[in-house]
């Protein structure tokens, strides 16, 4: 893969998953890692998302919309306010919408939404659609 990513031209895209549901976060990470196309990292406590993102340097962030300590929009606002992370695409995932609603282009605070749980193909499709390498023409 010779696409341009934040971490270098030959490195796999990095995806940060922020979700207080450790089972869902782990399954998404394992799925992305096992594809061989991505490097994924999970954060279970959303209050650690900014710190982890600064060190992990993601190319894409997947954030649960509703979490008890901080919700997805709060996490997104922190990431967007950080000069090193500003511009990194953020996608929310939630069980509050259906796959059909997500495909209709619904957005929350300007960010795409992925239904939770999503099928493997839905997850991979959304990742590819939102990685900087794949959206630039």
Where is each model-derived feature located?
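Conserved Asp/Asn-Gly motif in the active-site loop of CheY-like receiver
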Residues: 43-47
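Active-site beta3 strand of CheY-like receiver
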Residues: 56-62, 66
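Non-catalytic signal-transmission and effector/linker regions of two-component phosphorelay proteins
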Residues: 1-16, 121-137
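Two-component/phosphorelay signaling modules centered on CheY-like receiver
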Residues: 22-41
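A Lys-centered signature of the CheY-like receiver
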Residues: 116
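The feature encodes the CheY-like receiver
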Residues: 68-69, 98
């Amino acid at each position: 893969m010779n696409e341009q990513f934040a971490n270098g031209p030959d490195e796999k895209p990095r995806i940060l998953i922020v979700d207080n549901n450790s089972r869902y976060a782990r399954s998404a990470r394992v799925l992305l890692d096992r594809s061989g196309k991505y490097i994924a990292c999970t954060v279970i406590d959303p209050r650690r998302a900014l710190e982890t993102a600064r060190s992990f340097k993601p190319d894409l962030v997947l954030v649960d919309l509703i979490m008890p300590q901080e919700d997805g929009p709060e996490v997104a606002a922190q990431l967007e306010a950080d000069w090193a992370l500003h511009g990194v695409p953020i996608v929310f995932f939630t069980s509050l919408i259906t796959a059909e609603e997500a495909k209709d282009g619904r957005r929350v605070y300007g960010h795409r939404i992925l239904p939770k749980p999503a099928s493997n193909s839905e997850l991979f499709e959304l990742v590819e659609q939102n990685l900087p390498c794949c959206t630039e023409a």
